[in-house]
Regions:
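PAS-family sensory/regulatory domains
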Residues: 48-59
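Sensory modules in modular signal-transduction proteins
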Residues: 1-25, 29-34, 140-145
Length: 145
């Protein structure tokens, strides 16, 4: 397949796509597509050859990050929803799917990450949860089962 065509196809994706390479305990970004740049506000040349932990901006106390770490330690695929932060500091909820890429000797070479902004979906779920809790409290207050 023509590599130029492949790059154009990946850059045309509406979801952020990254390729990372393991380097010690880090997974270093070696490629990000245009959608990743739009999603995060970072240009590729600002963030390549860094671990993508910078997207958490110190917000590392997330169960999903622990789940992701376990998957990475076992060279497995994973899908998690994590809090990330754009270059301007604004929060977004990131549905991250990662998949390992192995060579012909079954050795881990890279991880492919696909990132999708699910902030609106999470906000809707939080509003629904709040409404359900308010309804439960009203029922409790008035003795309605």
């Amino acid at each position: 397949m023509d590599l130029d065509l492949l790059k154009k196809a990946v850059d045309a994706s509406s979801e952020g796509i990254v390729i990372a390479e393991r380097e010690g305990d880090d997974n270093i970004l070696i490629y990000v597509n245009k959608a990743f740049e739009r999603l995060t506000g970072y240009e590729a040349d600002e963030i390549l050859f860094q671990d993508c932990r910078f997207l958490q901006a110190g917000d590392r106390d997330q169960q999903a990050l622990n789940d992701l770490k376990v998957a990475l330690e076992h060279d497995e695929s994973a899908r998690v929803v994590i809090r990330n932060y754009r270059k301007d500091g604004s929060l977004f909820w990131n549905e991250l799917s990662i998949s390992p890429v192995f060579n012909e000797l079954d050795q881990l070479m890279y991880y492919i990450g696909v990132q999708k902004d699910v902030t609106a979906q999470i906000a809707a779920e939080q509003r629904a949860d709040k409404a359900e809790e308010e309804l439960r409290l009203l029922k409790q207050k008035f003795g309605i089962e």
